[in-house]
């Protein structure tokens, strides 16, 4: 991370003098430093960008944090400063631990956060929020999003035995299973219509316990809103149950759907989730294989310069294969 840019961002945040900076360790998409000034701790986050992935993560997250703050939602790290020149954010450092396993209480807390956000849908600030990354408002759009990911994986270059193993998995298992699933969903949804505006939700996107910290006060703090915006609530729920880092048992899906459908999207949400859940199980298998694509590999190295790329690729392939076998035995 460029130190003059970091110092400029910290100065804008009113932080100067004796500041200690250190790597924050393993992160997903971005380069993060932990800073300390006296008894004050904070994070400096630099956002990844790549020609193959031009999404403006910095501006999306800044806009969403502003929306949450204006709405009085406090279960988030407090933003301290934004520095567009270096695509840097300075955020409150939340003391606590990542949840190691989902519990009914944590799931309820996460859904309370999601619903609290969506009670602000009629606020003026909500109208200016962008569409979420890969937003989908019809079954066809959900299918097209995953189809695009499958097609990208079909272009993995055979540059190592690990890559060849990934290619074999995509060709022999992932792609054939997807073709069968896609055709079945297309038949089942032939008469489905697109979502009305009032059926859409404000989605944190990439929503799950992998993007939370349990604060020392016992409550969750939610973060990482780089893909947030308007979306289909069924997609938000499917992602929540499909993300692999802190799995949420499908047994809890009915209670979540009952809670959410009372406030967002109505009874149609449950039907779309039932239809689309295997689509999103496939999507998350694709996401696990992003490390075999140039933009995915470079994003990981950007966030963690010391990363052992070969070891991670091996682990990600094993996870993708296991997840796919569990979902599609």
Question: Where do the language-model regions lie?
Answer:
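Active-site acidic catalytic loop and adjacent metal/ATP-binding pocket
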Residues: 25-44, 183-236
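ATP-binding pocket architecture of kinase catalytic cores
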Residues: 29-148
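Short Pro/Gly-enriched beta-strand edge/turn motifs at strand-loop
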Residues: 12-19, 60-62, 185-196
């Amino acid at each position: 991370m460029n130190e003059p840019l970091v110092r400029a961002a910290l100065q804008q945040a009113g932080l100067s003098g004796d500041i200690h900076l250190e790597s924050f360790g393993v992160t997903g998409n971005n380069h993060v430093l932990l800073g300390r000034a006296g008894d004050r701790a904070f994070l400096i986050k630099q956002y990844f960008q790549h020609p193959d992935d031009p999404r403006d993560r910095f501006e999306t997250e800044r806009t969403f944090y502003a929306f949450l703050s204006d709405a009085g939602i406090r279960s988030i790290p407090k933003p301290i400063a934004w520095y567009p020149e270096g695509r840097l954010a300075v955020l409150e450092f939340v003391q606590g631990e990542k949840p190691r396993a989902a519990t009914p209480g944590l799931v309820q807390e996460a859904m309370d956060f999601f619903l609290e956000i969506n009670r602000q849908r009629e606020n003026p600030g909500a109208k200016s929020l962008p569409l979420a990354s890969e937003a989908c408002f019809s079954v066809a759009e959900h299918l097209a999003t995953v189809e695009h990911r499958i097609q990208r994986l079909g272009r993995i270059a055979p540059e190592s035995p690990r890559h060849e193993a990934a290619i074999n998995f995509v060709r022999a298992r992932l792609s054939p299973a997807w073709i069968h699933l896609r055709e079945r969903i297309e038949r089942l949804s032939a008469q489905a219509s697109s979502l009305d505006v009032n059926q859409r939700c404000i989605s944190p996107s990439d929503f799950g316990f992998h993007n939370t910290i349990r604060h020392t006060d016992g409550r969750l703090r939610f973060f990482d809103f780089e893909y947030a915006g308007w979306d289909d609530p069924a997609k938000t729920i499917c992602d929540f149950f499909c993300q692999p880092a802190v799995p949420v048992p499908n047994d809890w899906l009915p209670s979540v759907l009952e809670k959410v459908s009372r406030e967002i999207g109505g009874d149609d949400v449950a039907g779309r989730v039932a239809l689309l859940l295997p689509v999103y199980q496939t999507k998350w298998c694709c996401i696990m294989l992003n490390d075999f694509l140039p933009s995915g590999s470079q994003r990981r190295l950007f966030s963690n310069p010391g990363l052992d790329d070969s070891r991670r690729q091996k682990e990600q392939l094993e996870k993708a294969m296991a997840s796919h076998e569990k979902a599609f035995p």
